[in-house]
From Swiss-Prot:
Keywords: Isomerase. Belongs to the PhzF family. It comes from Vibrio cholerae serotype O1 (strain ATCC 39315 / El Tor Inaba N16961). The lineage of its organism: Bacteria, Pseudomonadati, Pseudomonadota, Gammaproteobacteria, Vibrionales. It comes from the Bacteria. Its EC number is 5.1.-.-. One of its GO terms (molecular function) is isomerase activity. It is an enzyme of class 5 (isomerase). PANTHER family: PHENAZINE BIOSYNTHESIS PROTEIN, PHENAZINE BIOSYNTHESIS-LIKE DOMAIN-CONTAINING PROTEIN. One of its GO terms (cellular component) is cytoplasm. This is Uncharacterized isomerase VC_A0395. Transmembrane segments: none annotated. One of its GO terms (biological process) is biosynthetic process.
């Protein structure tokens, strides 16, 4: 059986993860660092192109073997690209950095100017602009909400609270975001939200954020594209601008430029780089 595009030393472990029965389904594996630049090292993702879909359990096994925070799986069927995203704890419903890394891989391989990925949750469009990639994402309405009692003491400094897919705490300063101390055990108890985001204005031209999703195995995400679906529309309104920059204050850091595309969508511009050696 062939494991095309794999470094030899990684081929056998991945075959074992598939019980030696499906190795030929894997066409190519890459690792991309996404949302890099401006002293930010971004968020790594695995990108796997498959000849066809494997079972959910096999995709999850491969994700664990690849060992990145998220792995994007792509198929190319009847001229259409399809995508699914898996974190270490299982499948997730939308991943910005996984989408952009997958887009960078496909645009390079097929020499395309843009690519449309079809997913269970709608289309994701990736394009290349100079040294940046663009990712069109939905704009999520900010709905006022109460702080769940499980984390009420974590929100004592919040100056605003709202919800989308995620729970968002708006803090008074960049320093407050940097110094925020989460509690993974209590965050796992908030069943109605995907993750907790803390954010603050960063002058008049942008904002900062941190993103916590222990329910899906991500204690603190390094750089989160989908968080901009929640934050960009809020800060467009608050800061009176349709184009902002965002910085994620994680251990490695993430850098984004965001623009309002329509009333229902935003565009995220960012850099992504393929690692010199694929796994």
């Amino acid at each position: 059986m062939l494991c095309l595009g794999l470094v030899v030393m990684r081929c056998q472990p991945l075959r074992r993860a598939l019980n030696c029965s499906q190795g030929w389904w894997i066409i190519k594996i890459d690792i991309y660092d996404v949302f890099i630049g401006k002293s930010a090292f971004g968020n790594p993702c695995g990108v796997l192109e498959l000849n066809g879909w494997l079972s959910d359990s096999e995709l999850h096994q491969i994700t664990r073997e690849v060992g990145q925070p998220v792995t994007s799986f792509i198929t190319h069927v009847d001229g259409r690209f399809h995508i699914r995203w898996f974190a270490l704890d299982g499948e997730i419903n939308l991943c910005g950095h996984g989408s952009l890394g997958a887009g960078a891989a496909i645009l390079s391989k097929y020499q395309l100017e843009n690519v449309v990925f079809n997913s269970k949750y709608g289309e994701v469009v990736i394009s290349k602009r100079d040294d940046q990639y663009s990712l069109v994402l939905p704009s999520w309405e900010a709905k006022p909400c109460a702080v769940p009692v499980e984390i009420s003491d974590l929100a004592t400094d919040a100056i605003d609270v709202f919800s989308t897919r995620d729970l968002v705490l708006v803090l008074p300063s960049v320093e407050a975001v940097m110094n925020f101390q989460p509690d993974d055990d209590r965050l796992r108890e908030i069943n109605e939200y995907h993750a907790l985001i803390v954010t603050a204005a960063n002058g008049n031209s942008g904002y900062v954020l941190r993103y916590f999703a222990p329910k899906i195995g991500i204690s603190e995400d390094l750089a989160t594209g989908s968080a901009q679906c929640s934050l960009a529309p809020y800060w467009f309104k608050k800061l009176g601008s349709d184009a902002l920059n965002a910085r994620q204050l994680s251990m490695s850091g993430g850098y984004f430029e965001v623009e309002r595309t329509t009333e229902n969508s935003i565009t995220v511009f960012a850099q992504a780089k393929r690692r010199a050696i694929a796994i």
